[in-house]
Amino acid sequence: MTRSIAAAYRAGELPAFFRLPAGDLAAAASEPRLDVDRAALADALRAYHRDLGTLDSGVEAQLTRLAHPASRVVVTGQQAGLLTGPAYSVHKGADAALLARQLDREDAPVIPVYWVASQDHDAAEVASTTLLDHAEELHRLTLDLPQGVPVGRVPWQPEWTAAVLKLLDRFDTAPEYRAAVRARVEQAIRGGGSFADVFARLIHGLLAPTGLLVLDPLHPALAHLMAPTLARELACPLEGPARIEAAARRLEAVGFPPQLRRPAGATNLFLEEEDGQRRLLRFDGRQFHTDTRLYTREELLAVLEAGPTRLTPAAGLRPVVQDALLPTLAFVVGPGEIAYGAQLREVYELHGLRQPLLWPRLSVTWLEPNVVRLLSRLQATAAEVQADPEGVLGRALARERGAAAASAERLAALDAELRALTAELAALDPTLEGAAERTRARTTARVAHLQTLALRALARQEDERARQLTRLKRHLLPNGVPQEREMNFLTFLLKHGEEPLRKLLSLPPGAQAEVPLS
């Protein structure tokens, strides 16, 4: 089984790969960030929010607090998904706000910031979204985004508006809830701009009451502040990748698969070329090149000077650019980002920075009333269903039908009996001990496998009768993916009004929760 870097980090392992242990908020808060020009940062964010159409008194108040010389930031971010994308995109923003609220002090304000990954150019990852209505019909909407172009450069299209509103209008739910979500979406679209701008307005609209600020790295005022970090990277373009590869080898040596690899010559930089395509920069020791042409360092520095939004960081540099710009106290991250972080400690040091605290993000599975009833009958949690849906249903049916042959207790009793027999045989003839033990292990494993097959057969029979497993999977494993990684958060607002948002913002930071809805 593949070892999880995120699980190891949560357990306090891998100290050589992370500067601060998980949860060490006191240490993170005690480290001042005197190198950040907070006034310039606040001015740039003000310009962005003004252009986005979200600059109001609440944002101004947060920008004033950000300009405080001792201010810190709890930052999170995500790709700019369609209609906010999977639910965890909203969950991450909420967690940043919850953690900032916990850490906030009058003499050291802490502001939550959401980094909108507008530079990302993988259209396939952001162009689709999934919703589930009251009739338990899964709605999958996919827009035709151009591939290879940063989503912050892709103008929102009128036909996309029509497709989104058509989906909302045929969603089976209470009219008042549909109208409220429709109003949110229309307001986000009305401001115009890019695909990423619509995402940013939706995220901000949901979480603005918490004081969350949104940040788009493609906004010229913000990109200008990031240019010095990118210029430093151009000065030694292969050193960062070399440090990432060295960390990858160290991870492999202790049994963990690295998340990031940098092939020979690959830098940590992308260039948006004249045709609008974002391409990886490579360096051969003398010149830079993409798949299309060669560049000198001087040419790239001129690009950075003339249009700093065209030179953007790859995954191995993006967090460093973020934390050079922001006075980061904590970075709210998912499991994949934690795995990246295990390889970036020395990349931060290359830029004269200290890697901030990585805060494992809040995780929520929403349980609608019919799901709560089914889970109660099955005597299972949502997580157990997501891990093994057929097994959960099969075990429940075996209990109901008194099918002891498929129970864990029966297997344990068999194993205990075989262990006793093995010991007795070994006492009669010690040379038989090894063979007897191997026979016991094989027999127990084989019976366990047969039990699994029997339970799955029971589950299939029940599913054919009542479709209960299919219904549970539709809620908890839509399209075979755990709920918060697939289902759009707007699903729950469409069916339950503002209740999910209220409950989300009442959770403790970093919660791992299964939350019932009424």
Curated annotation (Swiss-Prot):
Keywords: Coiled coil, Ligase. The keyword ATP-binding does not apply. InterPro entries: Bacillithiol_biosynth_BshC (IPR011199), CC_BshC (IPR055399), Rossmann-like_BshC (IPR055398). The keyword Ligase applies. One of its GO terms (molecular function) is ligase activity. Its EC number is 6.-.-.-. It is an enzyme of class 6 (ligase). Residues 404-474 form a coiled coil. It comes from the Bacteria. HAMAP family: BshC. Belongs to the BshC family. This is Putative cysteine ligase BshC. It comes from Deinococcus geothermalis (strain DSM 11300 / CIP 105573 / AG-3a). The gene is bshC.
